[in-house]
Amino acid sequence: IGGATFDGGTVSTLHWGITDASGKSAIVEFDNGNIRIYDPGDIRAMTNDPQWPDMKAILAYWEKIGGSHMLPGTVSSPDRCVRANFFSHHVEAVADPSLAVSITRSILFNSCVPYTYLIQGEPNVSSTQWRSYADLKNRRYYFDIVTNMGYYYIDLTKCDLRKGASVMKLDTSKETMLAGEANNALKKSAPFTPLF
């Protein structure tokens, strides 16, 4: 997705997924300077490539084939999206937030690219370095970084999110043994400076 510049010079080459606490979602795509917003409907997975209308067509194709006997197995974005979407529709819906995160993690593990994976001549395929999950009801944001020994979360109900509050940061390059709630690892920091 080769979007033209936005936000003072940034170029977005990925899809942005937005979900509110009610579960309503939108997919934002930047396409040659145009912002396109899509309602994903019953699609529960998203990757950065290909463009959303093409991805919907690929998912519709695999929906007809079914996935009980065969799913695409490469590391390409479309194949990973098909696997994640299929499994998200074929797992138990649970009320327990911890179990829901565990189920989500297992689906994403199945659709990730192994860490340090590299194929020459395939610049659009890179290894998965992190996964994140949001519990919108309980306002917890989970992080699963491959170089960290566990996965952890920030409890947003315990963060000061008011205008003018201190910026807090968790330096994931220095924290490799986090598990569970990680609010105590947040440190005051200068605001994030974009690379552009």
Regions found by a protein language model. Give the residues of each.
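Structured, non-membrane catalytic/scaffold regions adjacent to prosthetic-group chemistry
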Residues: 1-40
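C-terminus-biased signal that marks the final domain/tail of proteins
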Residues: 9-12, 21-23, 44-196
